[in-house]
């Protein structure tokens, strides 16, 4: 029996798909994450934008091209939003985003397998994504995810530590829909970080919200043996007026102060971010504030995308900007982001850094430094090992590097 588990969307979706794959492998099945011939397809969908939702709906037809008689099981945010659309396509089973274990129950029941629930995800040799929470209570005016993922739910610290202890990966990434709000009973994200102080693994964080950046939080991170100082601090707009309309709960000035605080504790930190181009209320003046904050903060990387109105959100009721304006602003943001990324990497040329080797391809071993600079070393190096390197020049989306210690 062969199964394909195909995923669209965020890192949380990827972690959940990895759990589904690990469970199906326990059934003794051959499992792949690439669309190809299979007896069973599990399609994990996304609805963060209209384009993502469209691609999700098209997945059923794409799967059937490989095997018209395959059994198709659908889960994720797009099927949570519109379950009927998938049921009408004649798939075997549809669940949503909130309990993906139902997929396993449905498959186990149909094929006579033991329903043991979702397994811990099978990890790569280098990086383990550890899901610490799900859901979001923020209800930003443009975002559909809280309506689909539901209210925030966090895992016990003991369960998280147990999963980390079982992985052989040298790096773990704490992951979730809104990890800044992590809290099981009386524990907080700070408490979880402190509980990791004795781990020898490199600890990296998923996307963060502005409110979590405090001296207490940064001090806890300083206490880790091996912290990767990359802070993905979601911005969305550089304009305080637009942030208000987005229901983001901070101003431009407050965001900049949080970034300054990060640099006080971690001078070499990579601060990366998301910015929406062309939100419904965004004027040209507002947009210029988004453009200028890229240089002011010194972002190491900018993920920019055009505003996509999502039915069911507050912002959906607002008058949308013309597509050409959104497109033009997006291109300007992307260009500014490329300049900022290159400027950040140049700071580290001819300086010693470490990186964990991830893969060897076309004559290069690649991987990432703690501050998330992609490294290209023109040698074969064993994956999963940490090496000392010196960056020599900018190359593609990172930098060439020479090996200085094995």
Indicate where each model-derived feature is located.
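Short, solvent-exposed loop/turn segments at secondary-structure boundaries
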Residues: 52-54, 151-156, 183-187, 245-248, ...
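Glycine-centered loop/turn positions within well-structured domains
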Residues: 101, 138, 150, 180, ...
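Residue-level signal for inorganic ion chemistry
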Residues: 42, 77, 103, 174, ...
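Proteins enriched for Cys/Gly/acidic motifs involved in redox and nucleic-acid/cofactor modification
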Residues: 1-181, 216-219, 231, 253-264, ...
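Alpha-helix N-cap/loop-to-helix initiation residues
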Residues: 13, 49-52, 79, 210, ...
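Short flexible coil/turn linkers enriched for glycine and charged/polar residues
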Residues: 123-125, 136-138, 227, 237, ...
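Terminal RNA-binding accessory module
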Residues: 317-406
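Conserved SAM/AdoMet-binding glycine-rich loop
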Residues: 72, 81, 168-284, 295
């Amino acid at each position: 029996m062969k199964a394909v588990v195909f995923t669209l969307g965020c890192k949380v979706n990827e972690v959940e798909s990895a759990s589904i794959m690990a469970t199906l492998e326990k059934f003794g099945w051959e499992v792949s994450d690439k669309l190809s011939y299979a007896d069973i397809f599990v399609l994990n969908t996304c609805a963060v934008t209209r384009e993502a939702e469209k691609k999700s709906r098209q997945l059923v037809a794409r799967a059937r091209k490989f095997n018209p008689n395959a059994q198709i099981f659908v889960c994720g945010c797009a099927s949570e939003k519109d379950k009927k659309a998938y049921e009408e396509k004649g798939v075997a089973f549809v669940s949503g985003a909130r309990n993906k274990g139902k997929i396993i129950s449905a498959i186990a029941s149909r094929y006579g397998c033991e329903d043991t629930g979702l397994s811990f995800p099978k990890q790569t040799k280098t990086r383990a994504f550890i899901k610490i929470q799900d859901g979001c209570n923020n209800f930003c005016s443009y975002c559909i995810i809280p309506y689909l993922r539901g209210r925030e739910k966090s895992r016990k610290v003991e369960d998280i530590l147990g999963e980390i202890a079982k992985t052989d990966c040298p790096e773990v990434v704490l992951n979730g829909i809104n990890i800044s709000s992590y809290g099981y009973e009386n524990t907080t994200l700070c408490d979880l970080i402190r509980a990791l102080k004795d781990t020898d693994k490199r600890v990296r964080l998923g996307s963060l919200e502005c409110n979590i950046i405090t001296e207490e939080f940064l001090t806890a991170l300083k206490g880790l043996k091996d912290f990767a100082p990359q802070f993905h601090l979601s911005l969305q707009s550089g304009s305080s007026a637009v942030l208000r309309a987005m229901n983001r709960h901070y101003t431009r000035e407050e965001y900049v102060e949080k970034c300054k605080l990060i640099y006080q504790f971690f001078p070499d930190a990579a601060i990366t971010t998301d910015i929406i181009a062309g939100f419904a209320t965004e004027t040209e003046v507002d947009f210029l504030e988004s453009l200028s904050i890229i240089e002011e903060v010194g972002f190491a990387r900018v993920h920019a995308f055009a505003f996509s109105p999502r039915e069911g959100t507050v912002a959906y009721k607002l008058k949308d900007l013309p597509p050409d304006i959104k497109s033009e602003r997006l291109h300007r943001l992307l260009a500014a982001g490329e300049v900022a990324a290159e400027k950040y990497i140049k700071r580290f040329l001819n300086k010693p850094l470490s990186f964990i080797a991830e893969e060897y391809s076309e004559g290069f071993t690649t991987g990432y430094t703690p501050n998330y600079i992609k490294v290209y070393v023109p040698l074969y190096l064993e994956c999963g090992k940490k090496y000392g390197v010196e960056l020599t020049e900018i190359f593609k989306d990172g930098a060439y590097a020479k090996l200085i210690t094995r």
